[in-house]
A protein has these predicted regions:
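Conserved catalytic core of sirtuin-type NAD+-dependent deacylases
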Residues: 1-241
């Protein structure tokens, strides 16, 4: 299955030396982490508040208990393991073929797979800081805390993830844009490209090959040299580095 698509992608990868991968939630669903927008994703489940409300800056400040109840249960998957897509991208970087991974995910699975140059547009569950004194806490501290995690100084610990109503980290975005603009091949995977401003990043690509691998269609399919509607792990698994 997908032999023809894998073969076409292989030709493009063999012709590339500066690949950048731009990925979203679909990259991690094969590791057992639900996405937000698919039919069985978080937006289609019933909650007292919508996910957009809960994971917003103002909601976090007003209702930290409700925020953390949702966040720990629905956004922290500490047992998840990298899948073939994460592993193959790390291999491509080690082989000197991949410049960077630009991800909308917050799970840290790319780094767990061995990727070094990862630009996390929406932050990471693995970085958490006290809002009062700035002390760092890891994901285990958050997950194992009772209710709202507090620092030893008494301040509330906040995850370093970009909530609704918050801006992206300018340092990260600049590096991501630079990598995309330097790429000879851009592989877009596991994202429907509906989250802005992150989705607008791909407009900075002016290289040779644009590839889209996603289970459903995306807004960028039109310009793609190769479009594969399939789970990304199954495709990347068949690639030779």
């Amino acid at each position: 299955m997908y032999e023809k698509e894998i073969e076409e992608l292989q030709k493009i990868i063999d012709d590339s030396s500066r690949i950048v991968f731009f990925g979203g939630a679909g990259v991690s669903t094969e590791s057992g982490i639900p996405d937000f927008r698919s039919a069985d994703g978080l937006y289609h489940q019933e909650y007292k508040y919508s996910p957009e409300q809960i994971i917003s800056h103002s909601f976090f400040l007003r209702y930290p208990e409700a925020f953390y109840e949702f966040y720990k249960d629905k956004m922290m998957y500490l047992d998840a393991k990298p899948n073939p897509a994460h592993l193959k991208l790390a291999e491509l970087e080690t082989a000197g073929r991949l410049l960077a991974v630009v991800t909308q995910n917050i799970d840290g699975l790319h780094q767990q797979a061995g990727s070094k140059k990862v630009y996390e547009l929406h932050g990471s569950i693995h970085r958490n800081y006290c809002m009062k004194c700035g002390k760092f806490y890891d994901a285990d501290f958050i997950k194992n805390s009772d209710g709202v995690p507090h620092c030893e100084c008494g301040g509330i610990v906040k995850p370093d993830v970009v909530l609704y109503e918050e801006g992206l980290d300018q340092n990260v975005t600049q590096r991501a844009v630079m990598a995309i603009s330097m790429a000879d091949t851009l592989i877009i995977g596991g994202t429907s490209l509906v989250v802005y401003p992150a989705a607008g990043f791909v407009d900075y690509f002016h290289g040779k090959h644009l590839v889209v691998i996603n289970k459903s269609e995306t807004g960028k399919n039109v310009n793609a040299e190769l479009t594969i509607n399939a789970p990304i792990g199954k495709i990347m698994k068949g690639i030779r580095v």
